Amino acid sequence: MYKRQVDSKTSTGTAVFTVYETGEYTVEATQGGQSTSGTVNVTASTTSYAITLAFVSDTLNDNDWDTISEVSDAGEGANYWAIGDRKQVTLNGTVGSLSLSNFSTYAFIIGFNHNSGREGSGRIHFQLAKTALSGGTDICFTDGQYLNTGSSAAFRMNTSNTNSGGWEDSYMRNNICGTSKSTTSGRIMGAIPAELRNALKSVTKYTNNNGSSSASSAVTATTDYFFLLSEYEVFGNITYSNSYEANYQQQYAYYSAGNSKVKYRHNSTGSAAYWWLRSPRVSHSNNFVNVNTSGSVNSSNAHDSLGFAPGFCV
């Protein structure tokens, strides 16, 4: 193998060099005591080859979302970071009826390659949110309609009191979370930074998408970017939702480790909140499951406005 060392201190971080033999070349970059490398297979003398090298910090928050995504693609997230590690996110925009302006919060890791056989590999699963890089408070987002029923834009599962259609057809999924990177108005998708939006990966989630049915056939797949967690993903058991959801889901590592399930209102962090899960309650045509203010499983009417604590994958 032909070897050539190139030292570059260009402002762009780009180095260009010529090799004189075909074959596999290792390219290494060093910066601030960190090193990273990759290989290029040169097969023709008249072709230009490019490789992008990223420096990865073992402090999650010191990495940009592109770097986090590349580490995730390689299935290496757990080699750098830990469950519960946090990354700052600034939110701007209106989600439902909640207006957020330069709201700084922290996404935290809840799983590495979680349930990858069904949901997809090369994914780090996050949830929103915490108030600080360390310590702080677990929060969910609450709007001016919190604990009220109604049909207006708010953090409701549906604008009418029904769980028909389950998670798939819910107002929460389609109008608050959003199902496309390009449909952003009124959705959390539109409030996140563009860098995070570009790094988002779709995930396959299984849920009772019938509503009140207890049949196995009611549990079907959706493709999501933002999603609510399910009863089983949080608690590791089923109390109110379709028992067959457990056949397709796994409890998130963050919650199986015993971390608190209690979340507080983002705009009143001394007040614990009810926060929605995506699972419909079986044998109740108007309820979805949620987590109550003591961190226990609960269910409420679909048109109630409760706390919003979405997950996403990078």
Protein language model regions, located:
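Short, acidic Ser/Thr/Gly-rich low-complexity loop/linker segments typical of extracellular
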Residues: 6-18
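Intrinsic-disorder/low-complexity, polar/charged segments enriched in Ser/Thr/Lys/Arg/Asp/Glu/Gln
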Residues: 14-16, 24, 35-37, 46-50, ...
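Generic structural detector for well-ordered beta-strands
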Residues: 16-18, 39-41, 108
